[in-house]
Each structure stands twice: as C-alpha cells, then as structure tokens.
Amino acid sequence: MGSTQLTGRVIFKGDPGYTEAIKNWNPYVDVYPLVFVFAQNSYDVSNAIKWARENKVPLRVRSGRHALDKNLSVVSGGIVIDVSDMNKVFLDEENAIATVQTGIPVGPLVKGLARDGFMAPFGDSPTVGIGGITMGGGFGVLSRSIGLISDNLLALKTVDAKGRIIHADQSHNEDLLWASRGGGGGNFGYNTQYTFKVHRAPKTATVFNIIWPWEQLETVFKAWQKWAPFVDERLGCYLEIYSKINGLCHAEGIFLGSKTELIRLLKPLLHAGTPTEADIKTLYYPDAIDFLDPDEPIPGRNDQSVKFSSAWGHDFWSDEPISIMRKFLEDATGTEANFFFINWGGAISRVPKDETAFFWRHPLFYTEWTASWKNKSQEDSNLASVERVRQLMQPYVAGSYVNVPDQNIENFGKEYYGANFARLREIKAKYDPENVFRFPQSIPPSR
C-alpha cells in the first residue's frame, strides 16, 4: 500500500451510489470496478493515478460513459477516474475561444454555445462526453464547414502517468497537442481541460429531415453517395437506414444558408425514390441545434446492448456492398440494426493527413453499422453479424474510426491511425514510457 489518498467523490464497491456509477450508455460494456473517483479537479485525477500505481490496480478514465466497446473506460476490479463532475465552460466571446472542462457532455456544451451565438462541431449525440470524443477526431454535420472537433483544439491540460499536471499548446509540448488531435482518448494522459476555437454562429440555419420507404434504400443510397460528398460544404448530412422490421430510411442535416438555396441543393436527393416526408425549415440557430439533437437524460443510458463497427468509404459503393448492407438489415435478429453514413469533405479535407494525428482526411463518407439486443441469449448472434459485415466489406472500405472502435480489428494501429501510427508510438514512449495507460487497442510505446 502506498501513501497517496484518494480525493474527490470516492465510491467503492458496496458504497451508496455504486449501482448508478457502474451504468454506462451501452450496457454491453458494463463491469464491476473496485472504485470510482469522481474527480473535482486535476489534483483528484493525479491522486487517483498515483494511488492506482501504488496499489497495482488497473485504471481507466471516463467522461461521458459512452465508450462503445469493452474495457475502454471501465475495468473490472480496477479504478475508474470519472471526470463528469468537472463540467464548467468559460467562453471568451471577444476572441471566440471556449475553455472547457472534460466532463461536460456534448449536448449542454453545444446548446450553451448556440445560445451565446457560437457554433462548434461537437458531434451528433448529446450525451457523449467531450473528454473522449475530442481525442479521436470528433465530427458532426457542421464539420464540413468548420472542421473536426480536434482541428479546433488549441490547448489542453492533462495529468501524466506519474501524476504530473502538464499543459500542451502550440508552444509547449507541441507533440502532445499533435497526438491529442486524433490520437484517441486515454493514451497519453488523463485530460481535465480543453481550449477550443469556436465560431460565430449565423442568426439562422436551415435543417431538413427526409424519409423514404425502406424498400427504396438502394436507390436512396446510390443517390446520396453521388451527391453528399460533393454538395456545398455548408451542408452536412447523415443518412441512416435501420432494420427492415423498423422500416426507417432517412436523411437529416443542416445547411448554413437559406431554405430556397437548400431546396435547390437537395434536388438530387428529393428526386431519389419517392420520399414520404420532407421537412425543411429555417430556424434560429439554437432551435436548429435542438432539431438535430433533441435533449436526452444525462448520463445517457441505452436500454439495450449495442455492438459497433466503422469504416471509411473512399469509392462509390457498387451493388455488392449495398447488397451486403441490405441483407444485414433484413436479417437482423436482435432489437435493432442500422447503417449510418455522414458526408465528408470541405474543411475536414483541407487539413493535411500529417498535420494532426487524425489521418482519414479524404474519404467520400464515413459509415458505421450496429446491432442491438436486450436478451443475453441474442448477444453472440448479433456480435457475429456485425463482424460478418466487417469481413465482407473489406474490399469496399478502408480503415476504422478510433471513437467507434471494434476489438475484432487486429491491425488496429494502421486501421485507426494510418501512416501516423509510428509517430504516435514515439509520443507515447515520451509521455508514458512504462505504458501505464494501457487498455484494449491502446497505443503501445515505441521501443
């Protein structure tokens, strides 16, 4: 036993609050840690890291409870350092800079900024924590206009593997800032504060939601992939196709311009198949954000387990990958399955691949697919169905997104980080040479 004491809001197994503390957004990842430390400041994080090392206890850091695969932000029998109580935001309106503690969820952050007249590309799921999403890149329907979340990261405060509080920006620990802009959460330090560039929001924006009969998914997808990556970069759009039983096939997005202009831009999509609904409206900017991201309880808790996998589409999909998608959605055996797409390009693609750790700058679109279940007896079949799609899709996609990880990926360094993996390993060796911050698919230090 060491001399360091745990500080902050500490909950051991068996204490009041433990049952709530173990709940994550995805029940699939739930485990039973020894202790949770709900840090109130960087010193609590530092003490928890030192305590874990002194007591030889595995450790993880958690922000929004939104890790999508096992043992990433929680660990059985270990310590979970949860930063969700650290959720303050300081906005410098004159310089368009937001200093943000890493425990705040995306929803309250985006909506608070919108009310103050600013926008930022903070993702499309309001319960996700800013702590994790930033490190992996982070994107949403505004990213074609203003870049990835990580592209807007100017500085950070982190706690290293020895419990030292360090800062990184363009003039101090620049290599750590580079790695933190796409290198994945929890690898180099446990972050407690970010400084972001934010952008003046327009007074209004135009949003849309278009719904088609599920049976028209091939027609809709073919039209979407030929249109979405090349349309005006002020337009961000995702396409989501659910299981055949559910029957939903829809596109939703935002345009930083007028309704008249958007209707003109949407013509190729509106003329695909026979939409059953097309809701297009100009709203005050904060209301547009509410349209895209309705409020959800925080911390978020899904009522079903979910398995994800992800990839990038660099070429138009032929009939073969589209038929793989359709069969997956037709054969869904759990509670739900879906394919999600978002268009790429614009500001994202203007950043060189090696300027930050985020490598995937030039695909046409991003895609992820999921299967969900409530009954434990359905788990194996749903895990297998997601993996089968991953294998079948290999000829048609490239890479994978570290924020939507899949532990079936063996060559994860290349898949997540491309040619940037070697430099990330060198930076890991500098800031965490003993590999204290290790977890499934964490970056190993170079030797």
Swiss-Prot record:
Molecular-function annotations in GO: FAD binding; oxidoreductase activity
Statement: the UniProt record of this protein carries the keyword Oxidoreductase: yes
Entry EC number(s): 1.21.-.-
Family: Belongs to the oxygen-dependent FAD-linked oxidoreductase family.
Name of the featured protein: Uncharacterized FAD-linked oxidoreductase YvdP
Subcellular location: Spore coat
Chief location: other
Pfam families in UniProt: BBE, FAD_binding_4
Cofactor field: FAD
GO BP annotation list: sporulation resulting in formation of a cellular spore
